[in-house]
């Protein structure tokens, strides 16, 4: 029976393998999708303009609120930009309640967000209540969901991702809902900029890094997405609508589905059971929200078909989303039977041998490795197709996978070398810590400057 189990795991590992040639095809396909998205709206890659035309230099100063609405948490921040790439920050963080983020009505989540902002203002800026509008606190709002952005302050939600489902908000300006929530509480706040977290990561990396050639910002967290700097003359859909030589573009690449990359049985089962089945396929291969669930479904299959754990299903394994990606992160610290047993001890598995434990490590590793290899595709595609080949280039990244998943960036770089050869050495990849907060403040500063004619 153990021999059959070993063969089953080997097949699973093979199913999650993407060879170099498949990745090269994906690089070409990604660029074709990018070009279509720059031509017109409504394409697979949204290629949404951020209405930010320049990157910060590191010299920027100012005090701003930032509100970060991500896939798991809500953060309210007060940020002081000190210049020289430095900043100070105060913040509070709250977990998004399930009853608010899966609700027909938008009111519960707006009430939740507005109430937390009110508590933050009462704690840190009580004297601001009742001040004239010209003294309101400027805020940058990070809204990390696919949206049609029509100005620096207007962003219309296209669809929910990361497990959220609030139908009333679809095709609506979410920031306007927030503004109404603030007004109902007489909060002294003015939203100056609405950005995506990838744009925040990009501008934060440009602000804090000593590198002068930052061109991408990428999120590898609950979901995945990227932003980059594009030349205005390469964006036909903005012809005559914007000034300046460049535009920051939020790509919304989580929606990509490469025809050249196959889906495993576990991918198909996972996708079927998500609120947005058939969509965000790339994100469901790479996002931290999904890797643990893919592993859980693999374990379920091994128990059911190959009698792993004596065919017994621990209650924690039968529930969807019960195995988080942090479990895989802990497993990847060391390939040893002892480590696997310790990490999976809460699931009460009965291992027949140390080898069986190592087989599970191999299965988990294959899922994470595929995610890292797929993550190299957009980087390689943009590097090759935007005139940067042969040049030093800097990429800012943020999110739980690059921070906490062992060797994720190493595996990404391995695939990058396969795709662009020695050029991989010219690409620096660095953490843009607090990109969603600092980036929102930087974009709010840019918006205020433009409003005053100072940009």
Swiss-Prot record:
<dbReference type="Pfam" id="PF03727">
    <property type="entry name" value="Hexokinase_2"/>
</dbReference>
<keyword id="KW-0547">Nucleotide-binding</keyword>
<feature type="binding site">
    <location>
        <begin position="68"/>
        <end position="73"/>
    </location>
    <ligand>
        <name>ATP</name>
    </ligand>
</feature>
<dbReference type="GO" id="GO:0008865">
    <property type="term" value="F:fructokinase activity"/>
</dbReference>
<feature type="binding site">
    <location>
        <position position="222"/>
    </location>
    <ligand>
        <name>ATP</name>
    </ligand>
</feature>
<feature type="domain" description="Hexokinase">
    <location>
        <begin position="3"/>
        <end position="445"/>
    </location>
</feature>
<dbReference type="InterPro" id="IPR043129">
    <property type="entry name" value="ATPase_NBD"/>
</dbReference>
<keyword id="KW-0067">ATP-binding</keyword>
<dbReference type="GO" id="GO:0051156">
    <property type="term" value="P:glucose 6-phosphate metabolic process"/>
</dbReference>
<feature type="binding site">
    <location>
        <begin position="288"/>
        <end position="289"/>
    </location>
    <ligand>
        <name>ATP</name>
    </ligand>
</feature>
<feature type="binding site">
    <location>
        <begin position="144"/>
        <end position="145"/>
    </location>
    <ligand>
        <name>substrate</name>
    </ligand>
</feature>
<dbReference type="GO" id="GO:0019158">
    <property type="term" value="F:mannokinase activity"/>
</dbReference>
<dbReference type="GO" id="GO:0006096">
    <property type="term" value="P:glycolytic process"/>
</dbReference>
<keyword id="KW-0808">Transferase</keyword>
<feature type="binding site">
    <location>
        <begin position="196"/>
        <end position="197"/>
    </location>
    <ligand>
        <name>substrate</name>
    </ligand>
</feature>
<protein>
    <recommendedName>
        <fullName>Hexokinase-2</fullName>
        <ecNumber>2.7.1.1</ecNumber>
    </recommendedName>
</protein>
<dbReference type="InterPro" id="IPR022673">
    <property type="entry name" value="Hexokinase_C"/>
</dbReference>
<comment type="function">
    <text>Catalyzes the phosphorylation of hexose (six-carbon sugars) to hexose 6-phosphate. Phosphorylates D-glucose, D-fructose and D-mannose. Compared to hxk1, has a much higher affinity for D-glucose. Constitutes the initial enzyme of glycolysis by catalyzing the phosphorylation of glucose to D-glucose 6-phosphate.</text>
</comment>
<keyword id="KW-0418">Kinase</keyword>
<dbReference type="GO" id="GO:0005536">
    <property type="term" value="F:D-glucose binding"/>
</dbReference>
<dbReference type="Pfam" id="PF00349">
    <property type="entry name" value="Hexokinase_1"/>
</dbReference>
<dbReference type="GO" id="GO:0006006">
    <property type="term" value="P:glucose metabolic process"/>
</dbReference>
<dbReference type="GO" id="GO:0005739">
    <property type="term" value="C:mitochondrion"/>
</dbReference>
<feature type="binding site">
    <location>
        <position position="283"/>
    </location>
    <ligand>
        <name>substrate</name>
    </ligand>
</feature>
<comment type="pathway">
    <text>Carbohydrate metabolism; hexose metabolism.</text>
</comment>
<dbReference type="GO" id="GO:0001678">
    <property type="term" value="P:intracellular glucose homeostasis"/>
</dbReference>
<dbReference type="GO" id="GO:0004340">
    <property type="term" value="F:glucokinase activity"/>
</dbReference>
<feature type="region of interest" description="Hexokinase small subdomain">
    <location>
        <begin position="57"/>
        <end position="195"/>
    </location>
</feature>
<dbReference type="GO" id="GO:0005524">
    <property type="term" value="F:ATP binding"/>
</dbReference>
<dbReference type="InterPro" id="IPR022672">
    <property type="entry name" value="Hexokinase_N"/>
</dbReference>
<feature type="binding site">
    <location>
        <begin position="325"/>
        <end position="329"/>
    </location>
    <ligand>
        <name>ATP</name>
    </ligand>
</feature>
<comment type="pathway">
    <text>Carbohydrate degradation; glycolysis; D-glyceraldehyde 3-phosphate and glycerone phosphate from D-glucose: step 1/4.</text>
</comment>
<dbReference type="InterPro" id="IPR019807">
    <property type="entry name" value="Hexokinase_BS"/>
</dbReference>
<keyword id="KW-0324">Glycolysis</keyword>
<feature type="binding site">
    <location>
        <begin position="161"/>
        <end position="162"/>
    </location>
    <ligand>
        <name>substrate</name>
    </ligand>
</feature>
<feature type="binding site">
    <location>
        <begin position="400"/>
        <end position="404"/>
    </location>
    <ligand>
        <name>ATP</name>
    </ligand>
</feature>
<comment type="subunit">
    <text>Monomer.</text>
</comment>
<comment type="similarity">
    <text>Belongs to the hexokinase family.</text>
</comment>
<feature type="region of interest" description="Hexokinase large subdomain">
    <location>
        <begin position="196"/>
        <end position="434"/>
    </location>
</feature>
<dbReference type="InterPro" id="IPR001312">
    <property type="entry name" value="Hexokinase"/>
</dbReference>
<dbReference type="GO" id="GO:0061621">
    <property type="term" value="P:canonical glycolysis"/>
</dbReference>
<dbReference type="GO" id="GO:0005829">
    <property type="term" value="C:cytosol"/>
</dbReference>
């Amino acid at each position: 029976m153990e021999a059959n189990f070993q063969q089953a795991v080997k097949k699973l590992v093979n199913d999650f393998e993407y060879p170099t040639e498949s990745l090269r095809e994906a690089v070409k396909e990604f660029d074709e999708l990018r070009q279509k998205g720059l031509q017109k709206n409504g394409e697979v890659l949204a290629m949404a303009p951020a209405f930010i035309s320049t990157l910060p230099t590191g010299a920027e100063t100012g005090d701003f609120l930032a509100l970060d609405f991500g896939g798991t948490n809500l953060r309210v921040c007060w940020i002081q930009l000190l210049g020289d790439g430095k900043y100070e920050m105060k913040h509070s963080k709250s977990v998004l309640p399930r009853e608010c983020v899966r609700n027909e009505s938008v009111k519960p989540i707006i009430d939740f967000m507005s109430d937390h902002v009110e508590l933050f203002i009462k704690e840190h800026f009580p004297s601001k209540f009742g001040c004239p509008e010209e003294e309101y606190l400027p805020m940058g709002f990070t809204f990390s969901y696919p949206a049609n952005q029509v100005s620096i302050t207007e962003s219309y939600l296209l669809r929910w991702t990361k497990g959220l489902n609030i139908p009333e908000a679809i095709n609506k300006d979410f920031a306007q809902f927030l503004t109404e929530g603030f007004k109902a509480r007489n909060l002294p706040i003015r939203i100056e900029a609405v950005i995506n977290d990838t744009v925040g990561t990009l501008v934060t990396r440009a602000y804090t890094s000593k590198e002068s050639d930052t061109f991408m910002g990428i999120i590898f967290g609950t979901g995945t997405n990227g932003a980059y700097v594009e030349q205005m003359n390469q964006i036909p859909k903005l012809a005559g609508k914007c000034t300046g030589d460049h535009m920051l573009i939020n790509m919304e690449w989580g929606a990509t589905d490469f025809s050249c990359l196959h889906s495993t049985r576990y991918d198909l089962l996972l996708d079927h059971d998500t609120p947005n089945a058939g969509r965000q396929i790339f994100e469901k291969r790479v996002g931290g929200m999904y890797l643990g669930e893919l592993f859980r479904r693999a374990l379920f299959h091994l128990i059911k078909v190959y009698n792993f754990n004596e065919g017994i299903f621990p209650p924690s394994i039968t529930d969807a989303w019960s195995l988080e990606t942090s479990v895989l992160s802990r497993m990847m610290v060391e390939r040893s039977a002892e480590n696997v047993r310790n990490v999976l001890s809460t699931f009460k598995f009965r291992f027949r041998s140390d080898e069986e434990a190592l087989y599970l490590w191999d299965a988990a590793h294959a899922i994470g490795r595929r995610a890292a290899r797929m993550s190299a595709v957009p980087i390689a595609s943009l590097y090759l197709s935007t005139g940067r080949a042969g040049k030093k280039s800097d990429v800012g990244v943020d999110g739980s996978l690059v921070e906490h998943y062992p060797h994720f960036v190493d595996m990404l770089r391995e695939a990058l070398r396969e795709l662009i050869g020695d050029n991989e050495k010219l690409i620096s990849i660095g953490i843009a810590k607090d990109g969603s907060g600092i980036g929102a403040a930087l974009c709010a500063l840019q918006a205020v400057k433009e409003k005053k004619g100072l940009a």
